[in-house]
Amino acid sequence: GAYASFRSTLSAQPDRVATGLTREKWLLLLLRELDYGRVPTTQGGHMTAGADGDVRQYPVSHKWADVPIHLMGWGVDLDRRTEGVAGAARAPQAMVQEFLNRSDDHLWALLSNGRVLRMLRDSSALVGQAYLEFDLEAMFDGELFSDFVALYTMCHQSRLERLPGEE
């Protein structure tokens, strides 16, 4: 399948970060299977959040409807900054969480490096971070079908789609 093909190509890749490969050969395919269709990149390579003269830009890579989706490379740690890697000048987790907390227009986001997939929620009313994490590497290396069912159930586009009239 797509994951096995991606891992085979990844093992021959000299680039330890492998952002393009991870996105094109793995994560965008996974998102299609979760019914997001073709997920476009963000306009200008960023999204903005904030108000009253304190609007900031966040280097979120993709967006589906009103859901920010930040896709990093296999070699990028989501909890630490990776110098020289676009979208990881700050820890990707912290950056996406701050974006959600500062935005009035976004409640959910997806974040992944191909190894794990996180579904984040605006947590401005909570202390700390608010996310579910799915270990994609363990799930697909170990063929853990029941874990994939949980991922599919929680992260399917229908879970994050804002219906008309919802705020």
Q: Where are the model-predicted features located?
A:
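Charged, often low-complexity linker/regulatory segments
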Residues: G1-E33
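Short, basic/polar, glycine-containing "phosphate-handling" surface segments that engage DNA
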Residues: G1-P14, D66-V67, L71-E167
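Proteins with a high burden of low-complexity, intrinsically disordered sequence enriched in S/T/G/P/A and R
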Residues: D15-T19, Q57, E167
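N-terminal accessory segment at the very beginning of proteins
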Residues: K25, Q43-H46
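Conserved catalytic cores of phosphodiester-cleaving nucleases, focusing on short active-site segments
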Residues: W26-L27, L31, Y36, G50-E83, ...
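Short Lys/Arg-enriched alpha/beta "domain-start" segment
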Residues: V39-P40
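His/Asp/Glu-rich acidic catalytic environments and adjacent acidic regulatory segments
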Residues: Q43, G53-V55, D147-F148
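Solvent-exposed, non-transmembrane amphipathic alpha-helical segments
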Residues: H46-A51, E137
